[in-house]
Amino acid sequence: MRKVIVSNSVTLDGRVDEVRDWALPGDDDEFVKHHTDLLSHSDGLLLGRKTYEFFAAVWPSRSGEFPDRINSMAKYVASTTLNDPEWENSHRIEGDVPEAVAELKEQPGQDLIVYGSHDLMHSLLEHDLIDEYQLWVYPVVLGKGRSLFKDGLERMALDLVDTTVIPPGVAILTYQSQR
């Protein structure tokens, strides 16, 4: 069965707002190396509309191992307002998003990656569809803003399965669900 892997940047205090102000840029060598490795074991992206629109504006004009991979792989967009996603190999998820993602997990293939897409992540979390979290924890404290995990979630047990530290002190922590 395919896994759903959430890969998100987060501050030390768990915030995810204004990520472009404090996270590594998409062309940083360490960023590219680690995300290219993640994508080499994946064949699909699960994206919310806002993340999709940002990615679709940035990646199609770039080339290299990471942009070429992200441009060619399947992209599944959870949106009720985006009618015709134009980025190569993009598909809008229609109807019940958690049900559609559960069906995608059952299909043969490699893992599915969720980048950003805060609302989509929470919908998948509420339906126990996330298998792994790859959190890029940055040495920044915002003190306010939207948290990665919303208040009121049920307790979840996770296992830390990998740690990597890259300059400038970013800890990449990989957790798997204990279910």
Question: At which residue positions do the language-model features occur?
Answer:
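Portal/gating segments that form or line small-molecule/metal binding sites
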Residues: 1-129, 139-179
